[in-house]
A protein has these predicted regions:
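Juxtamembrane helix-entry segments on the extracytoplasmic side of multipass membrane proteins
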Residues: 1-3, 25-34, 60-67, 137-159, ...
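Specific alpha-helical transmembrane segments that line the substrate/conduction pathway
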Residues: 31-42, 82-119, 156, 234-253
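Transmembrane alpha-helices of multi-pass small-molecule transport proteins
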Residues: 26-80, 105-109, 158-163, 179-196, ...
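Specific transmembrane alpha-helical segments of multi-pass solute transporters/efflux pumps
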Residues: 16-17, 45-98, 134, 214-232
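Hydrophobic transmembrane alpha-helices of multi-pass small-molecule transport proteins
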Residues: 44, 103-104, 120-139, 156, ...
Length: 291
């Protein structure tokens, strides 16, 4: 499972931006977020109940300090990150470009973790960043960069980076953490939806988007992310985010026919090389944040 987890995570997570773009044709941002969070919460509560019934000894109640940390991570990942992520795509910015912005996470994570980074690792991180810059430059003639979209994308980047780093310091079972975070996020997002007056057109297409984002991404991919972060550390996992733009561009092209320039493909290839070699030189143990 540990070897398969990164590939499953990349496939599910990278499809998210395109599925959000698809679903937002039938729903407002906050209605989509609220519905997604509600379905995810129900799934996680059911999974937690089944798991705790079969293996009660493996799930222990968190301390007050641990619970506060879990809820802070939930606010960052389930509320802030997803809200900014959806808002960025709603501005019309390409899903591929949103994921390119999020691809900067591996550069931020080692510094937030106060981690020793070797010259070789730093060179590979900078190589990955160069690949992202090349890809964005290649896409600038194809897709107009919406200013608000970029701002929301950067806000999403910092939200998921801080959330992932803090998640690495949580020792509670990943299923318990995910359930608590979802229980926190759902009433917040539903409350915002009521205040702004969102709407949904219930079509088969929207239901497919909702199920994929609720079950596939928000439950499946999030549990995989938490599992990998706990096993490998935040810095090692964050480098996977370099690969997400490549797959996101592919999904965007397959579903919406979005064109990809040769320069963007070259940038993607550079990013892929950086990932392959970085994974061969694992980082030193992360110094946990918020001890």
């Amino acid at each position: 499972m540990n070897k398969l987890a990164p590939f499953l995570f990349l496939f599910i997570w990278s499809s998210g931006a395109v599925v959000v773009k698809f679903g937002l044709q039938y729903a407002s941002v906050w209605s989509f977020l609220a519905a997604r969070s509600l379905v995810s919460m129900c799934c996680l509560i059911m999974l937690f109940w089944l798991y705790s019934y079969r293996k009660p000894s493996l799930i222990r109640s968190p301390s007050k300090t641990e619970l506060r940390r879990i809820l802070v991570v939930g606010a960052l990942l389930q509320v802030c990150y997803l809200s900014f992520y959806f808002l960025a795509i709603d501005t019309g910015i390409s899903p591929g470009l949103v994921t390119l912005i999020l691809g900067l996470q591996p550069l931020l994570t080692p510094f937030l973790c106060k981690q020793q980074v070797s010259r070789r690792q730093l060179a590979l991180l900078l190589l990955g960043f160069l690949g992202l810059v090349i890809s964005i430059y290649g896409a600038k003639d194809i897709t107009q960069l919406a200013a608000y979209g970029v701002v929301f994308g950067i806000a999403a980047l910092f939200s998921i980076t801080f959330g992932t780093v803090l998640q690495a310091s949580i020792v509670s079972h990943v299923l318990l953490s995910a359930m608590c975070q979802s229980v926190l996020a759902t009433p917040i997002l539903m409350g915002i939806n009521v205040l702004v007056g969102g709407s949904i057109i219930w079509t088969p297409e929207f239901l497919i988007s909702l199920v994929w984002m609720s079950v596939g991404v928000s439950v499946g991919a999030l549990l995989l992310l938490m599992h990998m972060t706990k096993q490998d550390g935040a810095s090692s996992v964050s480098v996977l985010f370099y690969a997400i733009p490549l797959l996101a561009y592919f999904f965007d092209y397959a579903l919406f026919g979005t064109q990809i320039s040769l320069l963007t493909i070259v940038g993607m290839f550079v990013v892929a090389l950086a990932i392959v070699f970085y994974r061969r030189f694992p980082a030193e143990k992360v110094q946990r944040l918020a001890r």
